[in-house]
Amino acid sequence: LISAIVGTHFAFEHNYVLALFCLMLCGFFDSFDGIVARSKKDRTEEEKKFGIQIDSLVDLISFGVYPAIIAYSMGFKSFPCLIIFIIYILGAVIRLGYFNVMEDMRQQQTTEKRKYYQGLPVTSSCLIFPMIYCLTVCLSVPQAQFVYLIGLLVVGILFVANIKVIKPDFKGVLGLIGFGIILLIILIIKGVVLI
């Protein structure tokens, strides 16, 4: 949550590399909350439910609202852009609400770890949008920021799509973190100034 708040400052300063780095940090920190929660074996039912709810609220801000704020700071302020922001954020809200209901039911039936997600997880935005930005900068795509806006629309729809997405294990999470680091390095090498 703090990373998203700090990143919002960078977005409004038009420092998109640091804003997207903060988005990646949101994903990095989010990848460990489940590990920490599962290490607490003596949690009460209330604590488990609180954890699910607070995690989703933070995810909504960090991965549902914050990427739209970055796009808004890029100058997308027209009515059609507003519609895309609404679709993206509503997709994230619906996805998180659905996840909470399904996760609560799943935890009542089993203690096994979740193996897949229904719909694209909102946390995936922490790599998707930095990747879009990185590719458009590296390939010198004209009007690269429009690609980011289209990405918002597509990802917002995928949040609520009836698809199964495999949940990465610990090695998979480390691989995704490594991928995020590579994205950041590429941006630095291409000469995008961080500050």
Predicted features and spans:
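Membrane-interfacial alpha-helical segments at the cytosolic side of multi-pass membrane proteins
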Residues: 5-11, 63-73, 127-135
